[in-house]
């Protein structure tokens, strides 16, 4: 049975500071234009090595998060977190909020990339149990604060990520690629795609989806976020994963097609979530769901955050 891992939609009830009011990540060697990082692909999720205050850790790279979250530390981990205070967090699920720690002015480095002024949220209990589910030690999640000053190329076949200084780099157009605009809202990338739904026969519906590399599923749709987004007749209710605020349930089914510009994917699996479950995910009121790694891994993916461009080229996973 496929391991269900959900790392979506962490919503902060308390925001004591503006996390972008800092210098952010940069190349230490400014003469270089590219940094290449190897990653492990486990259950569709990218696991990268990085250092926090010079301590080597393993983090999931999650484009669906705009914060750095640490949730698997033991008494033997000497990370040296700085400027700590208590905060309250709320995530997907219908349970209560949870207590966490907020730590400021930490140094995070990834090879030749570094920031000395990073905010980290520390969840005192490992609600996700990702290490147990994935079979390797996972210390946390790092989101778009690592990505949003760069253009990145993600190769799911070779398992490499290339970071480019966006101002010095323009992705070369290719005949077999599709280029789509993205919207970056509160540090999170959104894309408009088309879905063909059972409820509307052969008509395609435009939907706004979060590009979410931290979600192992193919596609999530929020029921009734548009009039015709409803669970098809044939479905089964399932546990989709665990959020900070409890278990996340939804209806699993298939839809006739997903269209990403020139690329059409027939009969993708879809999870339909109700409005109560997704209330904390709607930072963007026009959002209709998420595009997860089960779809993303079928492409070589270029994301240029500063220029708000996504480019896709199908790879050997595409079918």
PLM regions: where:
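Bacterial Sec-dependent N-terminal signal peptides
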Residues: 1-26
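Pepsin/retropepsin-fold aspartyl endopeptidases
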Residues: 19-319
């Amino acid at each position: 049975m496929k391991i269900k891992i959900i790392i979506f939609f962490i919503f902060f009830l308390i925001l004591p500071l503006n996390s972008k009011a800092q210098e952010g990540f940069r190349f230490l060697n400014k003469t270089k234009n590219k940094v290449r990082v190897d990653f492990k692909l486990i259950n569709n999720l990218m696991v990268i090595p990085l250092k926090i205050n010079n301590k080597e850790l393993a983090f999931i790279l999650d484009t669906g998060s705009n914060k750095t979250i640490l949730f698997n530390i033991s008494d033997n981990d000497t990370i040296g977190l700085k400027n700590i205070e208590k905060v309250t967090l709320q995530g997907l699920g219908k349970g209560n909020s949870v207590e966490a720690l907020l730590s400021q002015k930490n140094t995070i480095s990834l090879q030749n990339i570094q920031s000395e002024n990073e905010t980290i949220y520390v969840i005192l209990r490992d609600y996700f149990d990702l290490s147990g589910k994935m079979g390797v030690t996972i210390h946390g999640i790092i989101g778009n604060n690592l990505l949003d000053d760069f253009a990145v190329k993600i190769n799911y076949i070779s398992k490499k990520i290339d970071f480019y200084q966006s101002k010095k780099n323009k992705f070369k157009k290719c005949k077999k690629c599709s280029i789509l605009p993205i919207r970056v809202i509160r540090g999170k990338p959104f894309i408009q795609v088309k879905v063909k739904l059972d409820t509307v026969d052969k008509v395609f519906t435009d939907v706004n989806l979060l590009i979410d590399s931290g979600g192992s599923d193919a596609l999530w749709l929020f029921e009734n976020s548009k009039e015709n987004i409803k669970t098809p007749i044939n479905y089964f209710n399932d546990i989709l994963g665990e959020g900070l605020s409890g278990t996340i349930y939804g209806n699993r089914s298939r839809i006739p097609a997903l269209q990403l510009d020139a690329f059409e994917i027939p009969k993708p699996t879809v999870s339909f979530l109700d409005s109560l479950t997704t209330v904390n995910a709607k930072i963007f009121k026009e959002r209709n769901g998420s595009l997860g790694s089960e779809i993303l891994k079928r492409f070589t993916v270029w994301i240029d955050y500063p220029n708000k461009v996504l480019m896709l080229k199908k790879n050997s996973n595409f079918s």
